[in-house]
Amino acid sequence: MHNNEHFNINNVSTLIFSGGGNRCWWQAGFVAELISQGWTLPKDIIGCSAGAAIAASLITDTTDKALDACKHLYADNPGLIRYKRGALKIPVGFAQNEVYPNWLKAFIGEEELAKIRAFGRLRVTASRLDRPSFRLVAIMRAIFRHLHGKDFIILGQSEYAHKIAGLSQVFLEPAQRQPLSEALQTFEASAAASPFILARRIAGELHYDGGYISPIPVFPGERVGGNFQSDLNLNLDPGEASTTLTLLTRHFETKPMLFSHYGKRFIQPSRKIPVSTWGCTADTTVDDAYGLGQNDAQHFLRTSILTN
């Protein structure tokens, strides 16, 4: 497998799939291409939002099935918003609230759940509502934070968190859930970006999109007294960088494809992913997102990509 000057992808011990809706098909194409060239998935995987489902498809070797199911569901869906049948077009909700769970069921069944249990460790992030009485305030703050956090490159160290007012980041493990419906619910919760996908109740508590709190998962203990620990040192030697690798779904023009930020390793798309994040109709270009991922993986394997 390809090495660059400071990085050997075979040394990655934890692979993180960030969220991004349909942009996560770039991750699917990228990793599927690496696997086709002989790479083996690390045994510790973390997924956020749609990235969690993509990770599950790669673990269970159902990525093609998941992509086909997505395209079929989108082809049968007339629009982003669902309307009540009748003469008056009364909106009743967002289509993804039905499409997304149906998509998960199309490629994650009992056999696939057994593969996830036998794989190693798959965790998905979600944002748990801690104070129901402040639900509206917590969600509004989370949405604004999420929009601000899209450009996490410019965030200061103190702006990363695993807890904000009313919400806490939690790691859910589908392999520990039984029956299958409860395992699927962890993936639904991780992508529950209200109002597009409604919150999911797990163990009596409401859970929302994992990306509401942080654009990338923040592990317990990474922040002490508002400061990052040594593994997030900005001056970390590239040769000693973390063996954790995060696959982004946004393109930052000031960064190369492979880069370090606060001591963490990231791979980003070579350009803006050509797909609508929340699109769910026949004209949603998920194939283009997947294809860009494949092309970027091929470029990654055959060229020397220097970190900053």
Q: Predicted segments — roles?
A:
Residues 1-45, 57-308:
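Patatin-like phospholipase
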Residues 47, 51:
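Gly/Ala-rich beta-loop-alpha elbow adjacent to hydrolase catalytic centers
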